[in-house]
Structures are given as C-alpha cells and as structure tokens.
C-alpha cells in the first residue's frame, strides 16, 4: 500500500512524515523484509485503527499486470465495485473513486512471489500517469523500455534479422518511491479542492535517465 505522508508529522519522521510503501506484517516474514531494508512501522488510519507492518521509502518492481476499477462506499453495506469502463454506472450509485492494483515482483522479495501494489487517487495517477501527466510507468516506458527496444532493433539489423521486438515492462526493474527534493526532504504536492485540499507525497520514478538516449 502507498502512504501519502503528512507534513504535520515532521517530528515523528519515518513513514508518517515522508510517505512510502507499507506492507502488512502478515504478508511476509520479518527476516526477509528487514534483510532488504524494510523497517518496522505502524500505520494509524484516520479512523484511529492501526496496522503493524513494514515500511520502505522506495522499492524496485517488475510490473507484470495492472487492473483498475471504480468503488462506491456505502454506510449500510460493503463497497460496490464497477469495471473501469463503467464510470457512469458507478457515479450513479454514489461517490465513485478509482483503485489501481499493480501485480509486481519486488526486488529482494522475489522468493515471496508476486505481490500487489494498491494505489488510489493521486498515488495511482502518479504511478501510472494519465492523459495530461506523465507517471513513473510512463517515464519508464519512454526511457528504459524505449532504449531496450532501440537496442534490440539495432542488434537485429546488424544480424540481418527482423526488427520490431517490444520489451514488456516486466523485463526490467522500475525503481519507484516517495518524491524527494534536491535536499532529500519529502516533496509535498497539493491535491484536492476547496476544503478537501491536502498536501501529500506521491510515488515517482527514481534514478531514471531524462531521455532514452541517456
């Protein structure tokens, strides 16, 4: 799961302040997690409920697949779920919010098997990108994947073979973590509207070249 951080939690530090990735304690064994840089952390939700788990500001993932859906919360029952292409139906049922699930392998935790990153709102947009904004996955495709495709074409031409090989996202590690400024401090952005405005930290690609040529 993605934690947005909170500028008001600077004194507390860690995930509460700077944001990052959180994994519940029962999802993997402690020895494997701590050996790969994960730190014990407690996530206290707005409701007051808390979860024990582990935190890491940045991870590297191999992206296998992505799925998205609309959810409508209910005060009287479970959430209603709608396919991504059925936004109008979701909106008619109530306040629709998107949820993105990204099936990945996490570098260092490959022995655990595939895991699912759960993202909503600004975090999902920052990870995947949108019509008017480039996300971590978009930048990954424009740089690492594009460079790999070009290298494959060049090698194929040299060998007199057919070109056009397209590398999938899962072929390379995508480093993605909490946004930081040049001083290494959390980079908060403003999201929401009117009274619902808040400042959060979103996931960004880490250490990618500016262009495929680099």
Residue ranges with predicted function:
Residues 1-118, 187-188, 192-210:
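OB-fold ssDNA-binding interfaces and closely related basic DNA-contact patches used
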